[in-house]
Amino acid sequence: MAKLTKRQKAIAEKIEAGKSYNFEEAATLLASLPAAKFVESYDIAVNLGVDPRKSDQVVRSATVLPHGTGKTVRVAVFTQGPAAEAALAAGADRVGMDDLAAEMKAGDLNYDVVIASPDAMRVVGQLGQVLGPRGLMPNPKVGTVSPDVATAVKNAKAGQVRYRTDKNGIIHTSVGKVGFEAGKLKENVEALIADLKRIKPASSKGIYVKRVTLSTTMGPGLVIDQSSLNV
């Protein structure tokens, strides 16, 4: 068995195995642990009472967190005409059509979000093998294919998170940076869970939000006592 590093030992000494933590307690504890050499994110994992093998129980959506994620988001938009001007005015980093597609095919993929207006999908459709593996392919289910590209850009810049259940019925997303006030972080998590409940599949039975776990990028996951959340 591999030996624990000094950092791992220091973390293990502060964590109570099997404990469900009050949200503020968990956030404060995670922030106090030995840090990595970069500003870590707070990440949330929510175990849902769904069967992801059934297509009608795949949970996929996007929501704008009230306090953002603390990340600077680079956005590319496929559109043209007045919509292109609106996208730039909303803060898009790059707007184009065939020219933008050519750049991406050549390897220029330094974007966090790619948005497209419906009329631009004829161009975007050629980029499936480029954008798909990186999770950048525009999709109407998460608001990245929209006739209102300006609003889509504003949402992305404001801290919109996109999520989808994995094969175990768990969604994972970042909800802020270490350094966020615990109250604001909590409101972000509550907004996410409220959105998950809003889109609960009709065929999902029993307990829907089964478990909520908060962690930092390089830190341990702490199970949250859901009674400490206003959801």
From Swiss-Prot:
GO molecular function, a single term: structural constituent of ribosome
GO cellular component: cytosolic large ribosomal subunit
SUPFAM superfamilies xrefs: Ribosomal protein L1
InterPro entries reported for this sequence: Ribosom_uL1_bac-type, Ribosomal_uL1, Ribosomal_uL1-like, Ribosomal_uL1/biogenesis, Ribosomal_uL1_3-a/b-sand, Ribosomal_uL1_CS
Keywords: Repressor, Ribonucleoprotein, Ribosomal protein, RNA-binding, rRNA-binding, Translation regulation, tRNA-binding
Gene Ontology biological-process entries: regulation of translation; translation
Pfam families for this protein: Ribosomal_L1
UniProt subunit comment: Part of the 50S ribosomal subunit.
Task performed by this protein: Binds directly to 23S rRNA. The L1 stalk is quite mobile in the ribosome, and is involved in E site tRNA release. Protein L1 is also a translational repressor protein, it controls the translation of the L11 operon by binding to its mRNA.
Family: Belongs to the universal ribosomal protein uL1 family.
Protein name per its UniProtKB record: Large ribosomal subunit protein uL1
Organism in which the protein naturally occurs: Pseudomonas putida (strain GB-1)
Gene expressing this chain: rplA
